[in-house]
Amino acid sequence: QSLKYFAALVNADKVNGFTISGKGTINGNGHRYWKSFWLRRKVIPKCTNMDELRPRLLYVSNSNDVQISGVRLMNSPFWTTHIYRCNNIKLLNLHIFAPATPVKAPSSDAIDIDVCSNVLVKNCYMSVNDDAVALKGGKGPWADKAPENGSNTNIIIEDCTYGFCHSGLTCGSESI
């Protein structure tokens, strides 16, 4: 089974040299999505992310030489930064935030590194209601069965600061 995702607010597929830089803010305005998720969870306690789909904030896939630097990424409806099947990635001086109160931002991982090589995460501030950095081995709960998925290699995370989060580094549920 392959897991389908909503398009992210910002998407880049097969864009070598993709760059976002500056002092701006990308705001996902996730409050409506979070409220909807928790309402559904209240009615159906076993509801999962697959039952209440939400968009990511930034998704980059199948790309080389990507740099995201200096921006604020906040209030993502779902994962904030999802990097999939990419090589030579720099995530520098980012401020990533999603609230834990008054409405929790469910599964608002700051950075998901997914089947990537040569990744540097440096001088980032992460405060989200889930994982700060999650290493994943492909998309979906059956990622280990899909031939297009694989491992992460040469990942460096340094000089980062963490606010509220469930973990600083997680080998995510899709890891193999």
Regions found by a protein language model. Give the residues of each.
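Extracellular/periplasmic carbohydrate-active domains that bind, remodel
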Residues: Q1-I176
